[in-house]
């Protein structure tokens, strides 16, 4: 029974905080990485500000670095919608989940999708969990190919770097 409550652990909280940062950065037209860094610095000085988990920073940085590609992927799976028409919180949730599906090799795809749906239940409209699940259900089909291509590119870059030393 306690296992069902375990999923709301450190990684879940980190994902929620990343959604908060992406949402706030978009609303205030700020750089999300700078915002997360600022809050992290502030948390050291002010006990009233919650510490920023390393995984939160990883998520925010990953989304920011890959935003155009992530948005292209999400947009390609929207039917009768544009990315701009989605609620901002749904955009943030989808961006994090897509980044995890493509780049977080330590996160099983089912976990990335389940966590995104859970965040949509907590933070968005009644229709959002089903919508988020539907989009990610399509994205998860291409995730293995994207991960393989990214791994091959990374390996080639490492081999190239080691050959130049």
UniProtKB/Swiss-Prot annotation:
GO molecular-function term, one example from the UniProt record: RNA binding
This protein's record includes keyword Transcription regulation: yes
InterPro entries: NusB-like_sf (IPR035926), NusB_fam (IPR011605), NusB_RsmB_TIM44 (IPR006027)
Coiled-coil stretches noted in the UniProt entry, renumbered to this chain: none
Keywords annotated in UniProt: RNA-binding, Transcription, Transcription antitermination, Transcription regulation
KW Transcription regulation (keyword) present: yes
BP GO annotations: DNA-templated transcription termination; transcription antitermination
A single cellular component GO annotation: cytosol
Family classification: Belongs to the NusB family.
HAMAP family hit by this protein: NusB
Cited function: Involved in transcription antitermination. Required for transcription of ribosomal RNA (rRNA) genes. Binds specifically to the boxA antiterminator sequence of the ribosomal RNA (rrn) operons.
Protein name: Transcription antitermination protein NusB
Gene: nusB
